Amino acid sequence: MAGNKVAASLAPQDTDTCLRELEHLAARIGLAEVRLDLMASFDVDKLVAASPVPLVLTCRPERERGGFTGPEPERLAVLRAAYDAGAAYIDVETGSLDEVAGWDGSPTRIIASQHWYDTMPADLPEIYLALRDRCDVVKLVGTAHAAADVLPVLELLDKATTPVIGMAMGDPGTCTRLLAPVFPQTLLTYGAIAATHLTAPGQITIDEMTYRYALGAVGPQTSVYLHVTTSDRGDRDVLDRQDRAARGTELHVSLRTTPDDAPALAARMADALPAITVRSA
């Protein structure tokens, strides 16, 4: 999937505020997720009609750590309104896929999402296979507590044959957000509009994605390097490499681990990700 895969994740107060933020961000993003469940009020039809970029509309229930606390039929009605309005995508939890299976008459595509807030399943590629025929896009998000936890996400992105969103929450997972655009089937990678507006742990800002990492310019011509680091100095060296790289020609990303674990982790990453040059710093 070509084009700018950087997506803003927004949780504004109301529709007009959201549209102003989208106008401000439009030149730096390819899509935007709008968290309807975190808004005080919203007009779905106006959002879809006036947005300068394609929208992913989400209404996450409280049981999935979202902000919607009303009855399930009411939440599904919000998603149906977004679907009928012609939003580019709606994000539907995997447990609710049966509820939307019969919807038609709209170009809106369905993202089936599943989150693990405390762990990282080792079998993300297998979970993807079980879901891919039930939706247009599979979104699988786990939590990384250690550097090795990001491997299932990167394997998922590498092996996917249909549109996919995959990332690891938590500080070790930041590298998955930066590497995601490298993989052909990746639909998007989320960024925050500012460091004070993070919507998930491990997020980085759109400005950093755009100006430091040039993710909007990443493509087949980009040489990609994953540096397994063991110190602050190693991390700084990787940032220096990225800052010196010409836009879109090289992507340098660090993954921090312990000195004892670094050689084995780098070997595992290199074996699993042949398209990426893995180095142990």
PLM regions with names:
Residues G95-H227, S231-G234, R244:
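Catalytic alpha/beta core domains of metabolic enzymes, predominantly
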